Amino acid sequence: MSNTAYIGSGTTLSSKYYLRSFYRSNREAGTSSKRREFSGNQLALADGRALRQAVRRLPSSDFSDDQDTNTRNSVLAYIQTYNNMLSSAGSSSDRTLERSAKQLKNITSEYSSELDKIGITINDDGTLTSRTTLFESADLSKFKELFSADAAYMQRTSTYAKRFASRGEALVASDNNRLMQKKNAAATGSSATDGTTTSGATESPDDGTATTAAQIVSQSLDLDTLLNTGIGKNINIIL
């Protein structure tokens, strides 16, 4: 049984409850104040997954009078999720995401008349808005025509929601791989710069200075020995 949880005919679940359940894989991405903390690709992944969850959950709704408020609230959460998806697609330069979002907008526009009958308006940018008075009074049978398991709108939306989520997942994986490569490159560069070997020892480059200095010291000691013993006072020593 789904998380819509038919807790009882007297239990009312808010649209925020449904929105959180749709964004269960990343609930902060479903919160307006938190969305700015994520990259565009992370939002695309979260929105795609949430939309997939929405089109799975909505068809399981009861669409009965005792679930009246819950049904409408779940659709309100769907509207927010759908709009979030369009937002993340619009801020992305990825053509696959753009195509999937465009297909979803085209599908939704085909049902503009049915949506209008339950108080949902399609705006010029493709986003959805509910008109409170009609949305709250429209017959539930009209909601069922759009959002039940047999509804073509849900079935078609599910296909492109899956594509959108899959592309978002691929983009995030690619971003993570690039980040890991940069970290590895930075770590390798740091080790090369400070001369650290794998054993942790630090090697100093030998430019011949150490050898020359040792030779000079050795020759100086020999010179001191000769002078102190009085032998070879007129000897010329070439260093």
Indicate residue ranges for each PLM-predicted region.
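Polar, low-complexity export/assembly segments characteristic of proteins
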Residues: 1-239
